[in-house]
Amino acid sequence: MADETAPSSKTVLGRSPIFTPEVINDIHMKAELGRYRMRGFSMFKPIPHWDQLMFMPGTLTRFVIEGYREKCLTKTVLGARFAKKPIELDIPVYITGMSFGALSLEAKMALAKGASMAGTATCSGEGGMIPPERDHSTKWYYQCIQSRYGFNPHHLMLADACEFFIGQGAKVGLGGHLMGQKVTEQVAEMRSLPAGIDQRSPARHPDWLGPDDLSLKIQEIREATDYQIPIQLK
């Protein structure tokens, strides 16, 4: 006689912590498309959030701070090794590069204002500089991307730091993809591309293929900016 208390196979599969209905649906979609899925907004998988950010104490490398009577400073200085004008942040967090197009003009301006209020920096992201964002940013990174969309040496000279885009967590190993619905006339003009169609960026930079080439490219930007600003990698 069958044990009526034993879970059925359907129940066991339904409780799988790995192959959830969402994961199975994603597999089916990829099988039908024959490639990875592309959409705007964010990743499908859960990612770390602010509540999971933790700083490890350096109790052996320096004296600890008595929190109830001493002030803890979070000031961070970047680029002091090579740059004549290192960038100073009040907190060790900055607004990473998100392009105009992926974000609206209002969103870019709001992030710039918020970063300035917090004493930190924001980044141009892909597609070049938009003047309102730069105007509201007290500290601003100019991003050099694989496609060179919107790249302007004159805008680079207005930056407090330069950032080479190599990869990002949302699309590891893949290039950029801006959906056609977001490619307005203004976005298209900045990138010198047609409006209303998807815009793709290559997965790697066209003028360097390894560490030696990257070193030369960094040196090129240092000389172009007269060693004034820091250079970092994303």
For every predicted segment, state its role:
Residues 1-93, 97, 102-116, 120-121, ...:
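Conserved, well-structured core domains of diverse proteins
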Residues 113, 128-129, 134-136, 148-234:
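Alpha/beta enzyme core
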Residues 122, 140-142, 231:
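Hydrophobic/aromatic residues located in beta-strands of well-ordered beta-sheets
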